[in-house]
Curated annotation (Swiss-Prot):
Disulfide bonds: none
Binding residues for ATP: G44, G45, N46, G47, A48, G49, K50, S51
Chain positions covered by the region annotation Disordered: 508-527
Protein name: Autoinducer 2 import ATP-binding protein LsrA
Task performed by this protein: Part of the ABC transporter complex LsrABCD involved in autoinducer 2 (AI-2) import. Responsible for energy coupling to the transport system.
InterPro entries linked to this entry: AAA+_ATPase, ABC_carbohydrate_import_ATPase, ABC_transporter-like_ATP-bd, ABC_transporter-like_CS, P-loop_NTPase
């Protein structure tokens, strides 16, 4: 008889996993397999069940039914500690570092002595091209650097199964390239990677196998090469997405007591004029934004975009220069006064600085009004406000008192936008609005931002996704090392030009530009 070679079992096999919360089914008998040396991409809309499934595999949540096997052996009563011992590590979408500990302490936290090798850590950092100061507190890092620290924690643990939840959402193209190189090195060692992403080109570049989740089940699964991009999108969003908000949504979205309608609707004066502003992380910034205009702010991580936004909002002090909002100098104003004047900021990290995760949805959506009016709340009014934004933004939730942390990432982002809109902005600063958001929710957010601009709100749009910047902005300012390297509009706005300018090149474009923000504006580049 011919000798038959036994096929080795999968690295990870999940069979019949189901889960429900408060009677709501979120996972429906899921089967999922990961082979050694394989990247298995996981796609799905916000709320499809991706994060819940991964939390079950990582031991954070128990399944209601089903079996998890690793190398053919069943894993019962998984906990995070037991999962780590088995070589399963989840790198979360939102970094969960200890803010007061150093970068090095975070990377080595609770590592067994035989794994806490500083030479190995230094080599991994070199492989990733990281130049982090290991002695600084993790809380002082930008989100992209915090994400790299989370990835380092997984790599240091010699993980056999590495679950990456939107790992490139805040990374530059160069950082993404280095991360992918490191992943390929791990694959050669037999490590299996679950790669959760909404960036379809990255999935095609990296993943051997893809599964698409929808409504708590697997809607599509197979070799990545067997499916077109349209196949994947249709599996995620079976109902065709409309190209714009419906008339009904626009009606619900109309800003209450729109400041622009109340004041100089026909004024040609800019909503905001920034003149020679300097502060921590940036210098000599000058630009202005008109009512109804979307001004893109592009640049690599560390260029000073978030620092500039936080200074405009009053979270950081300016060292020199002036900020004029509607002809009023707000440079010395506190944040609360700027908010009352109509300057509203949607921060990059929605969980750390944007939303109160354990507070009810209805309270969160009116939180900026609470800041202005005190802590006395009006539950009926809050419920009506939340219902209005639910209809306008298609926010999905079960009940008004539901804690924010129970929402999917895309619905959290929509709630944060609703919170900012309820403050009735003249100027809305939006920092990375689609980070970690799926294809359909991203489209919703784009249409939402355009509809806000149509109501004559001025918008500063900050994003690391250059295609997104080109798609959304009327003009783009490109920052490099804390200064504006140039301004682009019209046909001159393209990803290639922005990328080169973000890395410090002065390119020949149709719009005049200068080496500093002041010179760019004086030449008409930002007028």
């Amino acid at each position: 008889m011919p000798h038959t070679v036994a096929t080795p079992p999968p690295l990870l096999q999940v069979r019949g996993i189901s889960k429900q919360f408060s009677g709501v089914v979120v996972l429906k008998s899921i089967d999922f397999t990961l082979q050694p040396g394989q990247v298995h991409a996981l796609l799905g809309g916000n709320g499809a069940g991706k994060s819940t499934l991964m939390k079950i595999i990582a031991g954070i949540l128990p399944p209601d039914t089903g079996v998890i096997e690793m190398n053919g052996q069943p894993c019962f009563n998984l906990t995070p500690a037991k999962a780590h011992q088995l070589g399963i590590y989840l790198v979360p979408q939102e970094p969960m570092l200890f803010a007061n500990l150093s970068v090095q302490e975070n990377i080595l936290f609770r590592l067994p002595k035989h794994q806490a090798d500083k030479k190995k850590m230094a080599q991994l950092l070199k492989n990733l091209g990281c130049h982090l100061d290991l002695s600084v507190s993790a809380g002082s890092l930008e989100v992209a650097d915090q994400q790299l620290v989370e990835i380092m924690r997984g790599l240091m643990r010699d993980s056999r199964i590495l679950i990456l939840d939107e790992p490139t959402a805040s990374l530059t193209p160069a950082e993404t390239h280095r991360l992918f190189s490191q992943i390929r090195m791990l694959l050669q060692q037999g490590v299996g990677v679950v790669f959760i992403s909404h960036k379809l080109p990255e999935i095609r570049q990296l993943a051997d196998w893809v599964s698409v989740m929808r409504d708590g089940g697997i809607a599509l699964s197979g070799a990545t090469a067997d499916f077109s991009t349209e196949d994947m999108i249709q599996a995620m969003t079976p109902e065709a997405q409309k190209g714009a908000l419906t008339d009904s949504q626009k009606l619900w979205l109309e800003l209450p007591g729109n400041r622009r309608a109340q004041s100089r609707a026909q004024s040609q004066q800019p909503v905001i004029h920034v003149h020679d502003l300097s502060g921590e992380g940036f210098a000599h910034i000058s630009f202005h934004v008109q009512a109804g205009e979307i001004l893109g702010l592009a640049g690599v991580v560390g260029a000073g975009r978030t620092e500039l936004a936080e200074t405009l909002y009053g979270l950081r002090p300016a060292s020199t220069g002036n900020v004029i909002l509607e002809e009023v100098n707000i440079t010395a104003m506190k944040t609360a006064n700027r908010l009352a004047a109509g300057l509203v900021y949607l921060p990059e990290d929605r969980q750390a600085s944007g939303l109160y995760l354990d507070a009810p949805l209805s309270w969160n959506v009116c939180a900026l009004a609470h800041d202005r009016q005190g802590l006395w709340t009006q539950p009926a009014q809050e419920a009506a406000v939340l219902e209005r934004y639910r209809r306008a933004l298609n926010i999905k939730f079960s009940h008004l008192e539901q804690p924010v942390r129970t929402l999917s990432g895309g619905n959290q982002q929509k709630l944060l936008i609703a919170k900012c809109l309820e403050a009735n902005p003249l100027l809305l600063i939006i920092d990375e609005p689609t980070r970690g958001v799926d294809v359909s929710a991203r489209s919703d957010i784009y249409q939402l931002i355009r509809s806000i601009a149509e109501q004559q709100v001025a918008i500063i749009f900050i994003s690391s996704d250059l295609e997104e910047v080109v798609q959304m902005a009327d003009r783009v300012l490109v920052m490099h090392q804390g200064e504006i390297n140039g301004a682009l509009s019209g046909a001159a706005m393209n990803v290639d030009t922005i990328m080169h300018m973000a890395f410090g090149e002065h390119r020949s474009v149709s719009e005049p530009q200068g080496g500093t923000a002041s010179s760019a504006e004086n030449k008409g580049a930002s007028c």
